[in-house]
């Protein structure tokens, strides 16, 4: 191996390794952190939504006409509340009574609210049966994929679960933000790698040339 190649391997090799490690870090740690941030944002909005309903005194109950009430507050007519939350957070919210959607800010392609459809079996098992909070990266709202967070709703201070609150945000939009950040950092790392490789190449060439000159001088 020539002197120039040896010098290049010593200067450029660590740069390439560092760049690859940085890219791996971005694909794992950065993405994981962003997913945690999305989950926490959804969880916070779900808790705020639940608190907005729970502040009304009285039990959750179903009236003879099918409307769901919390004391004297008609949840089935709480359009202004869910729409205000959506406008303030950019997230859609849904109130489930049992496994049935009875109020939501989410609308279909015709602009109608997505109501009365049931939750999926896994969600029912996790939230309604086991009483767990549940985050999913694949919740479909009228064919549009969402990140979603589900939180059980209890009958006042009892252990009886009467339904759940859901908060979702468009998955494609969030992924675009995450991927954009990763691409930006990746591009910066690549530019830094190229610059360092250029400096290393120039340095290796200069050192190699000087060594050759020294050898020639010694031979003379």
Predicted region positions:
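Extracytoplasmic/periplasmic sensor domains and loops in membrane signaling proteins
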Residues: 76-90, 105-141
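Membrane-proximal alpha-helical signal-transduction linkers
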Residues: 40, 44-50, 206-220
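Short, hydrophobic beta-strand elements of compact beta-sandwich sensory domains
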Residues: 45, 147-175
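Extreme N-terminal signal-anchor transmembrane helix of membrane signaling/transducer proteins, especially
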Residues: 1-29, 186-190, 194
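Membrane-interface helix-start motif
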Residues: 169-188
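Alpha-helical transmembrane segments of multipass membrane proteins
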Residues: 197-198
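Core beta-strand residues in small-molecule sensory/regulatory alpha/beta domains
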Residues: 96, 124, 154-156
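Short N-terminal helix-loop-first-beta-strand/juxtamembrane motif that initiates sensory/input modules
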Residues: 40, 44-56, 80-103, 132-133
